[in-house]
Regions:
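An N-terminal assembly and electron-transfer interface module characteristic of large anaerobic redox
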Residues: 1-154
Length: 154
């Protein structure tokens, strides 16, 4: 979805007059249709596997995410991180650990910033955001994971 996010970002930016239409909508819509067709093929092939969850439509995921965070939050993974959490919650996955490598400050800000809003919309969610960088101690990670597991909601 990281690649597919760019189609939504462009639409949002053009509508907000943040970005000019350098490419015609016809070209971009065609690119989206081609990418979506390939995703549908992957979904069809992988559907044979018991635990496979099909890739959703990025525009539908963006619509759901607008309740939590502005789609103008495009730094790092931006609104995609909350979109994935919302998708998990809608599928009934209520225990989510978000691992952020190398101190990605943009993802750290979004993950911490949306935590309360996610819980307001999805009260059954058990959410933990862990940053992995050189300054994080193993004890801190283990303690936070143990606390997370103590709060697992069945």
């Amino acid at each position: 979805n990281f690649f597919m996010q760019s189609f939504v970002n462009r639409k949002v930016n053009v509508e907000a007059h943040v970005e000019n239409r350098q490419l015609s909508d016809l070209v971009l819509n065609g690119g989206y249709r081609i990418a979506r067709k390939q995703i549908n093929k992957i979904n069809a092939i992988a559907a044979r596997f018991r635990y496979f969850v099909p890739f959703g439509d990025i525009f539908e995921e963006a619509e759901e995410t607008k309740k939590l965070v502005s789609l103008h939050a495009q730094f790092g993974e931006g609104w995609l991180l909350p979109a994935e959490i919302v998708a998990f919650a809608r599928e009934g996955v209520n225990n989510v650990v978000s691992l952020q490598p190398f101190g990605c400050i943009a993802n750290h800000i979004v993950a911490k910033g949306i935590e309360k809003r996610v819980r307001n919309f999805y009260p059954d969610i058990n959410f933990l955001s862990l940053d992995f960088d050189s300054g994080v101690s193993e004890v801190n990670i283990v303690n936070r994971m143990l606390l997370f597991m103590d709060n697992l909601k069945k």
